[in-house]
Every structure is written in structure tokens, then in C-alpha cells.
Amino acid sequence: MKTLLTLGLLLLSVTAQAKVYERCEFARTLKRNGMAGYYGVSLADWVCLAQHESNYNTRATNYNRGDQSTDYGIFQINSRYWCNDGKTPRAVNACGINCSALLQDDITAAIQCAKRVVRDPQGIRAWVAWRAHCQNRDLSQYIRNCGV
């Protein structure tokens, strides 16, 4: 009985963990989902962005005290403008989704919302991490040896 309980707890802890993508796995997933060159944003830009926003972690969150918003998921999409978490004052929800959808191992919803973000006039510049770590840099290392 004790072994069964231990096994059950182990399985529960495994299912509660985030998926952390490997760099090339993430690049290939983005390519399969039409992100290569989407609105002029290269795969290397997306991979660099996710590296610096979430370290490729699907369940990453970051609370922003200033405006009481939270950044969600592998792309750290903000609840002030893009998703609804039921907690952020004056949220816009431009992606029309619940923020919890951005924390799934299946990143389809996160990709769709990221596409919506780059269609906005700011484009990829909406992400502070992209401006700080990726803009005007050689990003070839982010997709090197990935076969994309």
C-alpha cells in the first residue's frame, strides 16, 4: 500500500511539472507552426526571445507589481494586454484567451497569441527581453545545428 501511495505521488508530481523545451526542439516546433518569417520575425528571433523570457519553460510566470499584471508561459505573454487571468485590472485580452492556456505543454495557444502580438504595431518590440538581448545581434547560434 505504501509503495502504491508513493508511486501515485510520484506520478502526480511528474504531471505537474512544466515542459522545458530543448532549443532545437523549440525551433522545430515553431517552424511546424508557421513562425519562420511570420510578420518578418525569424525563427532565431523567436528562439532568442523565449530563451531570455522563460528559458523555454512552458509554465513560467512573472508578476509585475507596477501594473499588477502577470507574464505567462514560454513567451511571457502579459495579462494586461493579451490574455485574461481574472486578476489583472483593466485587462484588454486581445488574444481572447484565458492566461492558463499559455501555460500548457502544448504551446499551440501560446504560438497563436504570440502571432497576434507581432501583428500589433509594436511587433516583436513588445517584448522587453527581445529588445535587450536579441535586437541587432547575430542570432545564428539560436538555430545552429537544428536543421531548420
From Swiss-Prot:
Catalytic reactions on record: Hydrolysis of (1->4)-beta-linkages between N-acetylmuramic acid and N-acetyl-D-glucosamine residues in a peptidoglycan and between N-acetyl-D-glucosamine residues in chitodextrins
One GO BP annotation of this record: defense response to Gram-positive bacterium
Phosphoprotein found in the keyword field: no
Cysteines engaged in disulfide bonds, as pairs: C24-C146, C48-C134, C83-C99, C95-C113
Location of the C-type lysozyme domain: 19-148
pH dependency: Optimum pH is 5.
Free-text disruption phenotype from the record: Mice display increased inflammation in response to M.luteus infection, impaired digestion of M.luteus cell walls, decreased clearance of P.aeruginosa from infected airways, increased susceptibility to K.pneumoniae infection and increased bacterial burden and mortality following infection with various Gram-negative bacteria. Lyz2 is non-immunogenic in wild-type mice but is rendered immunogenic in mutants.
Subcellular localization: Secreted
GO cellular component: extracellular region
Leader peptide range in chain numbering: 1-18
InterPro entries, per database record: Glyco_hydro_22, Glyco_hydro_22_CS, Glyco_hydro_22_lys, Lysozyme-like_dom_sf
Tissue and organ distribution: Expressed weakly in myeloblasts, moderately in immature macrophages, and strongly in both mature macrophages and macrophage-rich tissues.
Top EC category: hydrolase
Annotated keywords: Antimicrobial, Bacteriolytic enzyme, Disulfide bond, Glycosidase, Hydrolase, Milk protein, Secreted, Signal
Molecular function as annotated in GO: lysozyme activity
Domain of life: Eukaryota
SMART domains xref list: LYZ1 (SM00263)
Listed EC numbers: 3.2.1.17
Active site, renumbered: E53, D71
PANTHER family: LYSOZYME C (PTHR11407:SF28)
Additional remark text: Lysozyme C is capable of both hydrolysis and transglycosylation; it also shows a slight esterase activity. It acts rapidly on both peptide-substituted and unsubstituted peptidoglycan, and slowly on chitin oligosaccharides.
Subunit architecture: Monomer.
Record-stated family: Belongs to the glycosyl hydrolase 22 family.
Function text: Lysozymes have primarily a bacteriolytic function; those in tissues and body fluids are associated with the monocyte-macrophage system and enhance the activity of immunoagents. Lyz2 is active against a range of Gram-positive and Gram-negative bacteria. More effective than Lyz1 in killing Gram-negative bacteria. Lyz1 and Lyz2 are equally effective in killing Gram-positive bacteria.
Name listed for the protein in its UniProt record: Lysozyme C-2
